Amino acid sequence: MLPYPQIDPVAVALGPLKIHWYGLMYLIGIGGAWLLASRRLNRFDPTWSREKLSDLVFWLSMGVIVGGRLGYVLFYDLHQYLANPTLIFEVWKGGMSFHGGFIGVMLAALWFGKRNNKSFFELMDFVAPLVPIGLGAGRIGNFINAELWGKATDVPWAMVFPPFSDPAQLPRHPSQLYQFALEGVALFVILWLYSRKPRPTMAVSGMFALFYGIFRFIVEFVRVPDAQLGYIAFGWLTMGQLLCVPMIVGGIFLIWLAYNRKPTAKATV
């Protein structure tokens, strides 16, 4: 069994002002995505300035934050937030939904593309390889918060999370680290290498949806479902897995469509 590192969720405290690691992880993810996007900017569109790229990253970040929070409210704990709506704004306590953030990003990309003469999939193909940076950082934030841990296990790398998080004090799968490794590191490597060469429009987006859906679906088998939901079907299906099914199907369809429709200009990201 591995010891859980006791990390204060508050990174910096200046009097009443507290800066949480969870929030810093979002900033790291956004900053890292911007830096890598700037490296590929000329390949995407030589006419784009760094200012326009910054605008894109800003609006996509808003889509992540707003969509992620509203997605959690709608998909995972609607009853609690209807009873106490002010809790919606307490983002630093956790409670973000990737699938909600994904919808938020798509809406932001659709809006930004129309304003800047870019198609939806041009932007999504450009952005997709950058997303795992934020996903990986977010999972580290979950780990520091000692939330979203896995099922009890006797594997050598199991961890006992703090009593405030897990009163049962059982050795558990550090599922946040599994997701960091798969959704952050592995997905980044797959998409970054795949997108180094010109690909048909929609192909990179399809690869993202497919592999994220697969990785998340797998990890959900060892992750404890949200207490307020539990398993929603068959005694094993979680909300996260259910939401991944359309991503996997949609990803396969986009890849098939990208390579089987009439030839068009290649998406260079």
Curated annotation (Swiss-Prot):
Q: Which UniProt keywords apply?
A: Cell inner membrane, Cell membrane, Membrane, Transferase, Transmembrane, Transmembrane helix
Metabolic or biological pathway, per its Swiss-Prot or TrEMBL entry: Protein modification; lipoprotein biosynthesis (diacylglyceryl transfer)
Q: What class of enzyme is it?
A: transferase
**From the UniProt record, which GO molecular function terms apply?**
phosphatidylglycerol-prolipoprotein diacylglyceryl transferase activity
Q: Does this UniProt record's set of keywords contain Cell inner membrane?
A: yes
Name the residues that span the membrane: 17-37, 56-76, 92-112, 120-140, 174-194, 202-222, 237-257
GO cellular-component terms in the record? plasma membrane
Cite the binding residues for a 1,2-diacyl-sn-glycero-3-phospho-(1'-sn-glycerol): 139
Concerning Pfam families, the annotation shows: LGT (PF01790)
Q: Where's it found, cell-wise?
A: Cell inner membrane
InterPro entries with a match to the protein in the record: Lgt (IPR001640)
* Record flagged with keyword Cell inner membrane: yes
Q: How does it sit in the membrane?
A: Multi-pass membrane protein
Q: What is its EC number?
A: 2.5.1.145
Gene Ontology biological process = lipoprotein biosynthetic process
Function, in words: Catalyzes the transfer of the diacylglyceryl group from phosphatidylglycerol to the sulfhydryl group of the N-terminal cysteine of a prolipoprotein, the first step in the formation of mature lipoproteins.
**The family this protein is said to belong to:** Belongs to the Lgt family.
Q: What's the protein name?
A: Phosphatidylglycerol--prolipoprotein diacylglyceryl transferase
Classification from the root reads: Bacteria, Pseudomonadati, Pseudomonadota, Gammaproteobacteria, Pseudomonadales
Q: Which gene encodes it?
A: lgt
